[in-house]
């Protein structure tokens, strides 16, 4: 009987040790979470916009401007309500004038802006005070104007839109 009690006692202690061992099968780890500054802008539309002036009014130097509003853009930003979009060209225009109108509901459109002389260092604000969030399908309107006194010319320009603080 004594032997049976010892065996039963050892069995119960073994069971208690097994339960304690299995109760310690967890581990913890600290996880650091960060959301970094995100600025993204994308333009949708034709790769090349063709603006051709082919009309004017007799007796007026200013020719009839050419306009295109087939492009849109999408923007996402999570940093600051002081965020803005700027526009610039790859090089100054020698003749004529190129203007841009960039719509926005998250920010304030600057209206139609002349970007003919705006290069990287002198980019023009086209949308200001953009709230944090995202919007898509916002219109971009280009207007090309020239005078009869400018004569005939052709130019190819690259327009860059940039999201900045």
Where are these regions (language model features)?
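Positively charged n-region of N-terminal signal peptides that target proteins for export
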Residues: 1-4, 9, 19
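Single-pass alpha-helical transmembrane signal-anchor segments
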Residues: 10-14
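Sec/Tat signal peptide C-region and signal peptidase I cleavage site
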Residues: 15-23
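N-terminal small/polar-rich segments of proteins
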Residues: 23-165
């Amino acid at each position: 009987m004594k032997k049976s009690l010892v065996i039963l006692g050892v069995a119960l202690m073994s069971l208690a040790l097994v339960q304690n061992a299995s109760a310690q099968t967890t581990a913890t780890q600290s996880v650091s979470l960060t959301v970094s500054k995100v600025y993204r802008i994308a333009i949708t539309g034709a790769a090349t916009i063709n603006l051709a002036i082919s009309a004017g009014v007799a007796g007026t130097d200013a020719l009839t401007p050419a306009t295109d509003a087939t492009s849109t853009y999408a923007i996402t930003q999570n940093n600051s309500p002081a965020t803005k979009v700027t526009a610039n060209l790859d090089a100054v225009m020698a003749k004529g004038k190129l203007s841009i109108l960039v719509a926005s509901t998250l920010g304030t459109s600057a209206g139609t802006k002349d970007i003919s002389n705006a290069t990287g260092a002198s980019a023009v604000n086209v949308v200001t005070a953009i709230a944090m969030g995202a919007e898509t399908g916002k219109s971009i309107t280009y207007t090309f104007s020239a005078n009869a006194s400018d004569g005939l010319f052709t130019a190819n320009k690259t327009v860059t839109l940039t999201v900045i603080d």
